[in-house]
Amino acid sequence: MQEIILSQEHKAWKHYLLAVKSKDNKNSDNLPDITVIKKEVTIDKAHLATYQSVCKFQKSDELSATYLHILAHTLFMELLTQKEFPFALLGMVHLKNTISYYQRVTSKDKLEIQVSFGEMGVHPKGKVVPIITRIYSKGKLVYEEVAENLKRVSSGESGEKVKARIEDDVLMGGS
């Protein structure tokens, strides 16, 4: 597994430039084993207050699940713009997020954020790219998220044929 440790001063702007680079290995069935890590993350209280105001959240020291999601965004971009990632970032479609918030987190906590890929899945319209975020406080997992994104891939088959093939694979236990 490759680990990429980000500094506190890491800036995201370069990722938006890298996102427009064209690369597309549509035949890839594997995602790279890379984890992007940011340690000793401290909360900027002015940023938190602005976020809470914009979202019409009550002012609080407690970090919402959505704020924790935002904290991980730079790491998402770092992961998705690695040269080993087989797909172009532009054109990917967000499908869903599944968030588990295990323990209250406040602006006083120092956090470690880790973002990595899960196992690539299939979808009637392409491939599902899961991005897993884990946030730790004092070494304990406090937040976990799986963001599923679709990489559209034309297989030459109609959507119904692909769906039927996937359902057959599931019923037969995979092949």
Feature roles, as predicted:
Residues 128-175:
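An exposed, glycine/acidic-rich loop-and-rim segment of catalytic or binding clefts
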Residues 56, 104, 152:
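Residue-level marker of positions within ordered structural domains that often coincide
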Residues 1-96, 156-175:
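Hot-dog-fold acyl-thioester-processing enzymes
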Residues 96-138:
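Hydrophobic beta-sheet segments that form the core/acyl-binding groove
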Residues 16, 51, 99, 133, ...:
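Generic structural hydrophobic/aromatic packing signal, biased to beta-strands
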